[in-house]
A protein has these predicted regions:
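Bacterial N-terminal signal peptides that target proteins for export
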Residues: 1-11
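Bacterial N-terminal signal peptides
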Residues: 10-21
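Disordered inhibitory propeptide/activation segment of secreted metzincin zinc metalloprotease zymogens
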Residues: 22-116, 190-217, 269, 273-281
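Metalloprotease/metallohydrolase-associated module, dominated by Zn2+-dependent proteases
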Residues: 28, 220-234, 244, 261-318
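Metzincin-family zinc-dependent endopeptidase catalytic domain
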Residues: 120-251, 257-277
């Protein structure tokens, strides 16, 4: 599915309006927010329960296209009222290999229909290395082979391939067809979700754990999925191109994999008082990789991305 945004021929003033991040003080438009909601996704827990594994789905975070009238989203799969907490890895977690490494792998089975496997894998590798290179932290992000398995517990739960378990802490589980994304955001999530990160947390007697008492639920594993219904590219598409940049979305989703939430405010001009809003009037404050809407190729972390990362990972044991 191609998702065209705006005509190529635009004025210089419009280019400045949409491409230059506005400060909050400069923005005079209407603030729009990502969708944050509870949704019953307990069906994804059935397989884990049947296997005797005390891990349960906690959140699904997704990034959307800019021309969809959607502004990203976070789904909480556990309704704990006003006590929604963050989630993070536990150093040396005995339930997770007992080491400080964060293991990751890239599924080599569910490849993109648009980009050769070697190119999409290389783009994901670069995204992982970008986060690894942030100097304030010393996370040992350790790549492990996929061993030829079709990894993906969530897709297995939906009878779309996959595997009833996991190997790595963070799994890039591949490009999935439209029904996968419609199932997590019915009825038409596949029309606007580009990528999604699923976070599973450890539980004990059905209650989320926080064994290191840091105010975050303990992460068991995370899976990242990409929407094959969109046209993908590794050529660095511009904001007006129909393609979606693999590395940009991977960089964003890995941010979720490393416990970052969406960041930044979004505004539309008051000339669009009601949705759906015109894409040409969307502003970010500030612009960040972790904005909940995809705009164009952004392969470098910006200051807010680095700041968020350092606040989470600077104290990780070296």
């Amino acid at each position: 599915m191609k998702s065209y945004r705006v005509p190529l021929v635009v004025s210089a003033a419009l280019l400045l309006a949409v491409l230059v991040p506005c400060s909050i003080g400069e923005t005079q438009g209407i603030q729009v927010k990502e969708s944050v909601r509870f949704q019953d996704l307990s069906a994804f827990d059935a397989g884990l329960s049947g296997l005797g594994i005390n891990a349960r789905l906690y959140t699904v975070q997704y990034i959307t296209t800019a021309d969809s009238g959607q502004f990203g989203g976070t789904i909480f799969a556990r309704n704990v009222g006003n006590k929604q907490l963050g989630s993070h890895w536990v150093p040396g977690d005995p339930r997770r290999y007992g080491v400080n490494d964060i293991f990751w792998t890239t599924d080599q089975v569910d490849e993109s229909s648009w980009v050769p496997l070697k190119d999409s894998t290389a783009a994901i590798d670069r995204a992982m290395n970008t986060w690894q290179g942030v100097s304030c932290s010393a996370i040992p992000l350790t790549n492990v082979p996929d061993y030829g398995f079709d990894w993906g517990y969530v897709q297995w739960s939906l009878n779309l391939g996959g595997y009833p378990g996991w190997l790595a802490d963070i799994t890039h589980a591949g490009w999935l067809p439209a029904p996968f994304f419609d199932s997590i955001a019915p009825p038409n999530g596949s029309e606007y979700i580009l990528g999604a990160t699923f976070t599973f947390i450890w539980t004990e007697d059905g209650t989320p754990t926080d064994i290191d008492r840091n105010g975050n639920y303990d992460v068991a594993f995370r899976e990242i999925y990409y929407n094959d219904a969109f046209e993908w590219s590794t050529e660095g598409p511009a904001w007006y191109d129909p393609e979606v940049d693999v590395e940009t979305i991977a960089l964003h989703e890995v941010g979720h994999g490393l416990s970052q939430a969406h960041f930044g405010k979004m505004f539309v001009d008051a000339s669009d008082p009601e949705p759906p809003y015109s894409i040409s009037h969307l502003h970010f404050a500030p612009r960040a990789v972790m904005n909940s809407v995809y705009w164009d190729t952004q392969r470098e972390l910006l200051s807010s991305d680095v700041g968020g990362h350092c606040s989470i990972w600077a104290s990780w044991p070296r």
